[in-house]
């Protein structure tokens, strides 16, 4: 009997339809960097609340300097000194000027600032009581930052869903926000399945291997924006598996296992989900990562990945990562895809969609993007995944690609929504 393989797009739609954004939490604005806002951010005051100087110099009435020139300079009396945080409370009248520092409010009566370097100080130190000379006119608004140049009170400075950059944290603070609401990091329970597995710090005996998947999946989970929770290694024992899975379902928002997802005699986890929950699919038309189970257990999404490291990696990238990002409130759920030219031929005889580990580089002479597959696509090898910056996507059906053919590559080294 033929296996029932569903298209990857169908599998992605099923997974995404069974996850929702997490509850809202309040965090300091600086901790929101890299996260999408859950609500619009509205300025409570004008930003900036006053017109201020763009540089150190002298604030003037432009009308006083209208006829100023090198042959007929204009001399003004310095009646005050102003710095950021120290406001000059008077009004500048005809023939008067105030020494001003960058960021200080422009006094009433003034409409321009002349930078210090082009002003001649005639006596004293150039501060209050001095006289200074100007040899050129000043334009209205010259070297003045207008009030509300960034935003007016009541303006939306950042929209819900917009990802906060480091500069955005400063913008939010300027708008009056010490903290903001974001969607909480989902807790993702991770379990490794297999009697043959030992912890990374242990020396494996004959027939044993170190559990590498848990470390990789926890790192990928963290990178996607979630909180990984490792529940350990479960041997090929139905009761032990059920105990760990039940605990993870109770404590987490999403549960991921690796191993026990193919057709072997010891694959108990899919049977557990069928018995106590609902299996929504268990085979996908892609390589690596054909044997992937997704379902609901205790109302929580469950994803069972292959024990093969490459298959687990691709399965996480294509299914778990978009789901986690949706739970965190991100709008963009997919890695960027771009086209590149093959540097070699690729033959494929299977119908499934392939995601081969590869490296894409730009030719320094032609500017063309060139993609080269890893020398081996052995799904047990981790080094090829570490060194790959993309997945070469080969669509369904047999093909015989030649060097120079243009193909699609999924840029796993770039964040979702990146502009290429």
Residue ranges and their predicted role:
Residues 25-30, 39, 85, 106, ...:
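Flexible glycine/proline-rich
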Residues 51-53, 66-71, 89-93, 106-108, ...:
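Solvent-exposed alpha-helices and their adjacent loops that cap or buttress functional pockets
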Residues 1-8, 178-305, 309-315:
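Helix-rich terminal scaffold detector
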Residues 13-24, 38-42, 124, 139, ...:
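Generic secondary-structure signature for well-ordered alpha-helical cores
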Residues 15, 57, 154, 190, ...:
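Residue-level signal for inorganic ion chemistry
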Residues 1-69, 99, 330-355:
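Short, low-complexity N-terminal leaders and the immediately following helix N-cap/first helix
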Residues 3-10, 24-27, 31, 55, ...:
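Conserved active-site and cofactor/substrate-binding residues in soluble primary-metabolism enzymes
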Residues 2-3, 8, 59-235, 370, ...:
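Short, glycine/charged-enriched hinge/interface segments at domain edges or termini
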């Amino acid at each position: 009997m033929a296996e029932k393989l569903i298209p990857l797009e169908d599998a992605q739609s099923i997974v995404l339809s069974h996850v929702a954004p997490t509850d809202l939490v309040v965090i300091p604005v600086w901790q929101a960097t890299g996260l999408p806002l859950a609500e619009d951010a509205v300025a409570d005051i004008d930003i900036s609340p006053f017109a201020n100087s763009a540089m150190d110099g002298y604030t003037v009435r432009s009308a006083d300097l209208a006829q100023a020139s090198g042959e007929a300079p204009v001399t003004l009396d310095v009646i005050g000194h102003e710095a950021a945080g120290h406001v000059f409370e008077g009004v500048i009248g005809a023939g008067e000027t105030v020494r001003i520092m960058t960021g200080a409010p422009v006094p009433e009566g003034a409409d321009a600032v002349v930078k210090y370097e082009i002003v001649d100080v005639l006596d004293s130190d150039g501060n209050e009581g001095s006289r200074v000379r100007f040899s050129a006119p000043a334009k209205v608004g010259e070297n003045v930052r207008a009030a509300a140049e960034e935003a007016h009170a009541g303006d939306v400075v950042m929209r819900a869903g917009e990802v906060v950059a480091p500069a955005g944290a400063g913008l939010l603070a300027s708008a009056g926000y010490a903290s903001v609401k974001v969607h909480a990091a989902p807790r993702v329970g991770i379990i490794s399945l297999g009697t043959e597995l030992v912890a990374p710090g242990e020396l494996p005996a004959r027939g044993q291997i170190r559990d590498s998947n848990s470390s990789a999946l926890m790192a990928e989970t963290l990178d996607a924006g979630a909180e990984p929770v490792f529940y350990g290694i479960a041997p090929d024992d139905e009761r032990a598996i059920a105990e760990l899975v039940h605990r993870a379902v109770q404590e987490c928002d999403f549960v991921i296992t690796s191993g026990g997802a193919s057709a072997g005699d010891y694959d108990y986890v899919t049977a557990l989900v069928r018995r106590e929950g609902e299996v929504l699919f268990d085979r996908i038309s892609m390589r690596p990562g054909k044997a992937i189970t997704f379902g609901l257990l205790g109302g929580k999404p469950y994803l069972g990945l292959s024990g093969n490291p490459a298959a687990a990696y691709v399965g996480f990238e294509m299914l778990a990562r978009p789901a986690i990002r949706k739970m965190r409130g991100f709008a963009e759920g997919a890695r960027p895809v771009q086209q590149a030219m093959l540097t070699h031929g690729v033959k494929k005889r299977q119908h499934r969609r392939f995601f081969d580990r590869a490296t894409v580089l730009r030719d320094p002479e032609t500017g063309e993007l060139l993609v080269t597959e890893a020398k081996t696509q052995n799904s047990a090898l981790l080094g090829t995944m570490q060194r790959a910056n993309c997945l070469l996507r080969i669509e369904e059906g047999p093909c015989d690609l030649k060097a120079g053919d243009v193909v699609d590559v999924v840029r796993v080294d770039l964040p979702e929504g990146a502009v290429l």
